[in-house]
Design a protein with these regions (language model features):
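Transmembrane beta-strands of outer-membrane beta-barrel proteins
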Residues: 77-79, 110-114, 139-143, 190-192, ...
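Outer-membrane beta-barrel initiation region
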Residues: 15-142, 219-245, 330, 343-350, ...
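Gram-negative/organellar outer-membrane beta-barrel architecture
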Residues: 69-78, 83-225, 326, 389-392, ...
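Flexible, surface-exposed loop regions and adjacent strand-edge segments
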Residues: 159-163, 206-215, 268-271, 304-313, ...
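Sequence/structural signature of outer-membrane beta-barrel proteins
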Residues: 100-104, 117-123, 148-152, 199-201, ...
Length: 413
């Protein structure tokens, strides 16, 4: 997904599993240390904004890194028109606005983002996300609220499904996720949250004829509901979350959905998101990045639309090479590696090669029996040299002719 937007601030929520889509500047999230280069080194670099200024012969003052201006005043950007693309949505028109401020000079920037998206497939997405920091970053409050009308594909359960099994599920949904984290040590946080997900007007559209679908076997109902507290752990040593060149990231979310909170039946889930970034070679600006994303149903039976699935992570980035929703099951394990390298010395152009593998448990045995690999390559175009935000254009391949274009603002992980 991509948002063509030149604003400085967006927000990235790390609140839990994701079944409600988001089409905004997701990966170009607010960084906890926005100043990623000195003015001298930044001005040696080139980005899209520099090129546009040169083309229009801009006489505006020399650009500054607005991310280092620590003001308590709320700065608002927008509304701004934009455009996006994903395999699930096709092209999309977007209107977005965001704001930022510093609660204290010694705190990370607090940010808010909202948008309205209408897609070529008649889908509607309206998120509101916020990330607030207190003095000395002692507390972090994360909010992720969304409304969607999002008809999209499902292919059934497990790893043996085929592309011909696919059909549309029509639904509307809201999610109300929020969490409060407290600093335990440098770069380490833990806290508690509350997540509510509600789906309604769920219906199958032109399912395979003369066949009982996996959704019907699993339990097709016109509504799905999940409510529960979350227990969160976060460890993040990256200096730049938009385009990391080193460090580690670990995010663990345990979510018990108990009947006392209105669930039809109790079920529990666990998400473990781990990433590592290594400069390779060490003296270069090239980066070797690894990502592990495991999404497990510990016990009980999750609603069908809230089960682990391809592209079901918070920013719909797992499984490049396959359409989101291509595989689905009670448990998912995922691993990806990517090599990111410069093409031009001025940083304007870069490239990547990547490979991933995902596996889902079979419904009948609850065992992992198949692996779906994905692989591909892509280009990077530097949009903002101060935050190192790239426009990412990747083409991914999967098994049995699967493939497509994957577009992001910022790195995939």
């Amino acid at each position: 997904m991509l948002l063509w937007l030149f604003s400085s601030f967006t927000v990235k929520a790390q609140t839990g599993e994701h079944a409600v889509p988001l089409l905004v500047a997701d990966s170009a999230a607010i960084d906890t240390s926005l100043k990623v280069c000195t003015p001298e080194t930044c001005y040696d670099q080139l980005d899209v904004i520099d090129i546009v200024r040169e083309i229009v012969h801009s006489k505006a003052p020399k650009r500054e890194d607005t991310g280092v201006v620590r003001s308590s005043r709320l700065r608002i950007a927008g509304p701004v028109p934009a455009a996006g693309y994903s395999l699930n949505t096709g092209f999309a028109g977007i209107v977005t606005a965001n704001g930022s401020f510093y609660a204290r000079p010694d705190a990370n920037p607090s940010t808010m983002l909202t948008s309205f998206t209408y897609t070529a497939n008649n889908q509607v997405i309206i998120p509101f996300q916020a990330n607030f920091w207190t003095s000395n970053n002692k507390y972090n409050v994360v909010i992720d609220w969304r409304y969607v009308y999002f008809p999209s594909y499902t292919f059934g359960l497990g790893g043996y499904t085929t592309a011909s099994d696919g059909y549309i599920i029509d639904y509307s949904a809201i999610r109300v996720h929020q969490a409060v984290l407290r600093q335990l040590a440098e770069n380490m946080y833990a806290g508690i949250g509350y997540n509510l997900d509600y789906y309604w007007n769920i219906k199958e559209v032109n399912p395979p004829a003369n066949k009982v679908t996996d959704f019907e076997n699993y339990g097709l109902t016109p509504t799905e509901f999940a409510s529960g507290f979350t227990f969160n752990f976060l460890y993040d040593t990256r200096k730049n979350s938009i385009n990391p060149d080193g460090g580690n990231f670990v995010n663990v979310i345990y979510r018990p959905n108990l009947t006392i909170f209105g669930n039809t039946a109790s079920w529990r889930s666990l998400v473990v998101d781990m990433r590592k970034y290594i400069k390779f070679p060490g003296s270069s600006k090239n980066v070797l990045a690894f990502w592990s994303y495991d999404w497990l149903t510990i016990d009980g039976k999750a609603p069908y639309l809230m089960m682990p699935n391809t592209g079901g992570d918070p920013y719909s980035n797992t499984g490049r090479g396959y359409i989101p929703g291509r595989f689905r099951g009670a448990n998912m394990v995922y691993l990806e590696g990517e090599y990111r390298f410069q093409i031009t010395n001025n940083g304007l152009l870069g490239g990547v090669v990547f490979a991933n593998a995902e596996s889902f448990t079979e419904q009948s045995t609850n065992t992992f029996q198949t692996i779906a690999p994905g692989w591909g390559a892509g280009l990077r175009l530097k949009l903002n040299k101060f935050s190192r935000t790239n426009v990412a254009l990747d083409y991914g391949f999967g098994l049995n002719g699967s493939g497509g274009l994957f577009v992001n603002l910022g790195e995939v992980f």
